[in-house]
Amino acid sequence: MRDIAFVAFLFAFIGLGFRKPFLFVLCFCYIDIVAPQRLSYFLINSIPISLIVFGLAIVGWLAVDDKKDVRWSGRQLLLIVLLLYCWMTTIQADFPVEAADKWSWVWKALVWAIFLPLTLRTKLRIESLVLVMLLSAAAIAIAGGIKTAAGGGGYGSLQLLLNENYGLYEGSIMSAVGISIIPLILWYREHGTIFPPDWRVSIFCFALVFACALLPIGTQARTGLVCLVILAIL
């Protein structure tokens, strides 16, 4: 049943993207954070869904999107230099095959970081991206928060939605991300327009903040605990 739910949601998301190509961008962000292909047992775990949506997002932007307000920034040029530097140091590493395998995810992440600002032309698009990223991270944070409140957790033993160290499912990374998005959650509670501020939005945002605050406790990861202390000071 879970596989059917993932497939139905992804196909609906991708289908809407053919009408509004910017939705491919949001769909890729969801896939990159939640990794539904790794949560699936058999229907989509053998399909390179991330690469497919990545390609659709770029092709959709090139073919359809309005580019009159597109601007390149110095940051994107620096990222291109970093991409070239990563490639050069990888092929010249002492163990190039192992290095290429270890950092295979970096290439797509850097290309996406260069490409993404080109698509964010309006405030609505920026807010849509923020909302999708928050809700995607919330899917992991809420699961971790509930398990921490119910059973405690422990370093390397708190299972989030996925029982392996992949992306945000690695305890140290997710605990740091959970604390880092708390200011963004509170900002959205006050200034969101897709879901305008009301008591339901406030309850969800406060509950999500509480779940995020529990993550460093449940994972017992130093990175998250340091982030929590710094956030409390600020």
Where would I find each of the regions flagged by the language model?
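Non-cytosolic membrane-interface motifs at loop->transmembrane helix junctions
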Residues: 98-105, 162-164
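Alpha-helical transmembrane segments of multi-pass inner-membrane proteins
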Residues: 8-17, 83-91, 108-112, 127-160, ...
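Transmembrane signal-anchor hairpin modules in multi-pass inner-membrane enzymes, especially those
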Residues: 1-88, 97, 101, 123-131, ...
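Hydrophobic alpha-helical transmembrane segments of multi-pass membrane proteins
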Residues: 14, 100-103, 116, 170
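Alpha-helical transmembrane segments and their membrane-interface exit regions
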Residues: 34-36, 56-61, 108-114, 232-234
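Flexible, active-site-adjacent loop/turn segments at secondary-structure boundaries
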Residues: 32, 37-45, 153-160, 164-167
